[in-house]
Design a protein with these regions (language model features):
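Short, surface-exposed, charge-dense and proline/glycine-enriched linear segments
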Residues: 35, 56-66, 135-139, 159-167
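Hydrophobic transmembrane signal anchors and adjacent membrane-proximal interface regions, especially
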Residues: 37, 119, 181-185
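Short amphipathic alpha-helix that is part of the acyltransferase structural core
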Residues: 1-35, 145-182
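Acyl-donor-binding surface of acyltransferase catalytic domains
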Residues: 66-70, 81-150, 156
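Conserved donor-binding loop and adjoining core beta-sheet/short helix segment
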Residues: 6-12, 19-105, 109-110
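Short, surface-exposed recognition loops or helix-turn segments adjacent to catalytic cores
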Residues: 131-134, 180-184
Length: 185
């Protein structure tokens, strides 16, 4: 396993290939979009990378961000689907914990049971869920007629703020009770 502050062009390509293979297999990217952008176009100077290679191929990757002095270090990792269950994820996460200590945030993307099992095996606790929702714009139906007594207007700060915050808090409580997301040790 290599711990690097910067990836070479070849390593960068191999990591992106791993992410593409995993995305194709799982149906969802294994890491966040901002990390993909860091990989493609250069990231923060404080980013570091852990690589596990076999047969000239990256089979495990961890992106480590230690810049958040309040919430603590954050890691996202990906293991080639062909090597899941072979200890690659466990080795990566063990090494990250050696580097960062136990105050660590781990992001898990999607519903891959193996990722959630790995987090649980290290006693991470799920603390947040992020949902991405979308709707095709090609099948939008016309809006129903609106009762003339109903007034539709823009948000008015100072007038609508309390009601909006109350509704927003109610929705966030519902969202937080759902699956998949971020874990903490």
């Amino acid at each position: 396993m290599q711990h690097l502050d910067h990836l070479s062009d070849t390593q960068q390509s191999l990591v992106l290939e791993l992410i593409n293979r995993t995305t194709h297999h799982d149906g969802t990217p294994p890491i966040a979009e901002h990390i993909l952008l860091h990989l493609r176009y250069g990231g923060d100077k404080a980013d570091s990378h852990l690589l596990v290679e076999k047969d000239n191929q990256v089979i495990g990757y961890a992106h480590l961000d230690q810049t958040d002095l309040v919430a603590g270090p954050c890691v996202e990792l990906v293991v080639d689907p062909s090597y899941r269950g072979a200890g690659v994820g466990k080795a990566l996460l063990s090494e990250v914990i050696k580097i960062c200590g136990k105050s660590l945030r781990l992001w898990v993307h999607g519903e891959a049971e193996v990722a959630h099992s790995l987090a649980a095996s290290f006693n991470f606790e799920k603390i947040r869920t992020v949902l991405q929702m979308s709707k095709s714009l090609s099948d939008i139906q016309p809006l129903p007629a609106i009762d003339k007594e109903i007034i539709i207007r823009s948000f008015l700060p100072g007038i609508d703020s309390d009601d909006w915050l109350q509704l927003n808090n109610k929705v966030l409580k519902i969202i937080q009770s759902r699956a998949a997301g971020r874990y903490l040790i």
